């Protein structure tokens, strides 16, 4: 079993209430070992967020509401990240993307190669990935099927993500998004229509902008796309 680890999750869990880098590193090592044992993993890959992120280039306010939490990071936070990458051979810094993107890319590659894997994260955004997931904070193992993952993805496009400062369509939360997609035979077309109904002539632009922020890569540079002719046809029906 290959563990595909969102390293940022273990990193933030490890610095909680820790006074020194050495204490946090010890905690990280403990979390890492316990996680692999919990899912019976024989190997792993792990990603930590690097210094650059295309989403910030697209939308400077992306995750802007997390400024306070960033300011509360210990002075040794970045040194700890570097130490982890140096210590763990299977760990990398991301390049122009986020740990989430690499997790989904690796999971997608495993699916194509028929490699048993488990996604390790507490981030619900990764529920767009089919297969087995493990939440190390709750110690919970669960499985996502293809239909759930697909609907979850399009619900996210409708709602945006207040945690990351992504607007989506205002006043659409989980229940309303579920109702919009409930009887849909084509989630993509239904979402196109919802954006048009709220934003009018600007609907396509808002859909692309939100989609590019929400969409988690399945392969490198796998940016969100919807063809304009598909959108135009969807809003006419």
Regions flagged by a language model, labelled:
Residues 37, 60-62, 197:
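Short, mixed-charge, low-aromatic patches
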Residues 27, 41, 65-236:
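Extended two-metal-dependent nuclease catalytic cores across DNA- and RNA-processing enzymes
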Residues 8-9, 57-60, 124, 164:
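Flexible, active-site-adjacent loop/turn segments at secondary-structure boundaries
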Residues 15-16, 58-60, 129-134:
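Short acidic, glycine/serine/threonine-rich loops at helix termini
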Residues 54-66:
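Short beta-strand-loop
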Residues 1-45, 49-57:
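Non-catalytic, usually N-terminal nucleic-acid engagement modules in DNA/RNA processing proteins
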